[in-house]
């Protein structure tokens, strides 16, 4: 029988594995669990064996084996939140979202704290993201947003709103994306005694989002205005870790302007381990008629094992496009 500390570490380890490509998504989760871990000294050193084994199997591309492992775990421990989230995540990666959501629903039922329930609800939201279903993603992200609102945790509310917006923009629902990005910006700035660097972070993200939305709407002048504003905020030097998101932004805007050569130059400067970037590079090469390079990048994106907006966009699209490319 696992201890509460082991169960908590299992959940954290799972979220690290499934959200590794998009680090700020994991930070939201780990922050909410920190007080609980503080109540179980030494538990940080423990990690259930099924989580370690499952992570390794997924890295090796053995999703069926990982799923079987998580199901065996649930036979022995039917209330394991980590195992429910893990099993559902694997099913989403396999394109079996309807099955996966049964595990997330059960995770919501067995969650023993609001924070744990938020984790399961967030996983459910991401399940719908794999199907580009903005409406259902928002339905569950709203519940997570409200939980953090009850705690007056404005930063995490902002993170959740931005996550919902990211799903909506790539689902093609630009009005919803704008609403949630604006909500994330405005809510994040409510943080008491907010530091200038944090303010700049929210301004950078908001300009970044507005540029992408304008590009998707075909308004290049507006997109370029917001790119300039984002560069301005970044130029303050308060958030150097955001550097990788500028070439992503410029490549994204160029892609939707139809300037695929410029898009490629910028996207190749962005985070090459991000499945979203890998997929966009594949799309760009495909537009340029370079099928072999497109195949290479789609292949990379298709093997992502994260459970976040980046993978939710990349994995289904990359796999679909791989089947359409001439052999």
Roles of regions detected by a PLM:
Residues 59-60, 93-94, 130, 163, ...:
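Register position in tetratricopeptide repeats
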Residues 86, 119-123, 156, 163, ...:
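Canonical tetratricopeptide repeat
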Residues 72-73, 106-110, 144, 184, ...:
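Canonical positions in the second alpha-helix
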